[in-house]
Amino acid sequence: MKLVELVACYKALGEAKVTKLEESEVIKIVKARKAMRPFAEEYDAFLKDVQEKFKPENFDEIQSNVQKWKDLSDEEKIATNKALAEYQKKVNDAVEAELNKVVEVSVEKLNENSATKILLENGWELKKLDEIEVIL
């Protein structure tokens, strides 16, 4: 699976309520998260490094401008938006290759009933199942 899929699944499973699942299914989720954790944590550390290294010198000023957005002139808003967009593009470009890496993780699949129960218990839309597809 691609790292981007793993990270999304890891986060979704971490946020998911699973009180209505059978005990054996909850154990599958816990074991899946355990197998995914090293990859997800390594990516989070990588992302933080990238975000830190690409911060422009005036990043604190940019963040301050965001906080006082209503008080900014149109020119200041444009400049702030431009600076944030440039920063975000650099970060996105830097992490894209990392997210597209294929990682090998073995996880036990949940049964179909568990997918339905997770969906209903968490009030998720059907498309949320795409994020946890790797264990379905």
Regions found by a protein language model. Give the residues of each.
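A composition-driven surface/loop motif
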Residues: 1-136
